């Protein structure tokens, strides 16, 4: 019969819990942000979910800096997502919060204005926030062996002008097509790098 030293087991458990508090497990969540959370960030969330598959340990969410709270996906964007077989019908726009930022490993925005707005509100999260297309672009520099979250947190490059994804809201079918295409192309580089 095996005897257990209960005191030693409790002491070890306390040490593990203390370590977890000091070094919490890395989040496996990506937050996408745009203005209204009805076009670009919503598209990124649902395309990322589709590309990563149901068995991925990564989760994806989206929010807006000026969200049209409770709204579904914008007209024309919905058609673009449907044509790609992307499931987005449960979407309800929401406003970005400190809690969403805290829970996320990375926050990928569509324009520099989104980055600046978030940093003004919550400067402590600056290292997590980058443009979506910027991450796709620098992935080629980093190589697949580099941890993407650590690499992006350490990245000290300003985004390039071409990293911006223009807002397609109320600009018609062509603007929606271009935005969704740019988002999808960026995510086809990012999702494999995450190992999702």
What role is predicted for each listed range?
Residues 2-104, 112-116, 192-196:
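Conserved active-site segments centered on acidic
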Residues 4-10, 20, 119-196:
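Phosphate-binding/catalytic loops
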């Amino acid at each position: 019969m095996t005897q257990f030293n209960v005191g030693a087991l409790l002491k070890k458990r306390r040490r593990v819990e203390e370590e977890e508090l000091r070094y919490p497990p890395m989040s496996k969540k990506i937050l996408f942000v745009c203005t209204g959370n009805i076009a670009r960030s919503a598209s990124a969330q649902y395309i990322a979910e589709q590309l990563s598959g149901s068995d991925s340990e990564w989760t994806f969410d989206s929010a807006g800096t000026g969200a049209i709270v409770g709204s579904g996906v914008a007209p024309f964007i919905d058609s673009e997502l449907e044509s790609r077989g992307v499931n987005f019908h449960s979407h309800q726009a929401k406003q970005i919060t400190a809690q969403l930022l805290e829970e996320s490993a990375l926050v990928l925005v569509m324009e520099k204005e989104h980055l600046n707005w978030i940093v003004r509100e919550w400067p402590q999260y600056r290292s997590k926030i980058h443009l979506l297309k910027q991450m796709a672009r620098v992935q080629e520099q980093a190589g697949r062996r580099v941890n993407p979250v650590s690499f992006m947190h350490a990245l000290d490059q300003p985004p390039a002008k071409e990293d911006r994804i223009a807002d397609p809201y109320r600009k018609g079918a062509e603007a929606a097509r271009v935005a969704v295409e740019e988002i999808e192309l960026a995510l086809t580089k990012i999702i494999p790098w995450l190992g999702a």
